[in-house]
Amino acid sequence: MGSAFLTAVEAPMHENAKQAVLKAQDIDIVSCGECTGEPSWQIRNKLADELLKIEAENPRDVAAKLLMEASRGSLAAASRDGDLDVGAVMTGQVCGLITEIKTVRNLVVDLCNDTEELLRKSYTLAL
């Protein structure tokens, strides 16, 4: 759900980052930062490739320090400045299912409607 709310009309996210989430598929998402103990999913880009290389080529403690240095300011670069090369666009693997920018209201209404439909279907299966 977080990824959907990132792309909401009201979200304070640069339009470039929102469009990157809409274009991304599940295979475009990588997990970075395991060496820090705080891994995160993000869209593969120049920064993500650099972070993955750091993690692959260094001992965990060294990689953690290098990764923190390499990623400093990267969230702001993507979300505020719209720089998709050096910015971290953090989104989950579900981003492939996000196909349009909606208002928060519409996201919540859709969630409620979808949940109601699933509950109705699961109830009839149980009979």
Give the positions of each predicted feature.
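Conserved active-site-proximal phosphate/metal-binding subdomains
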Residues: 1-127
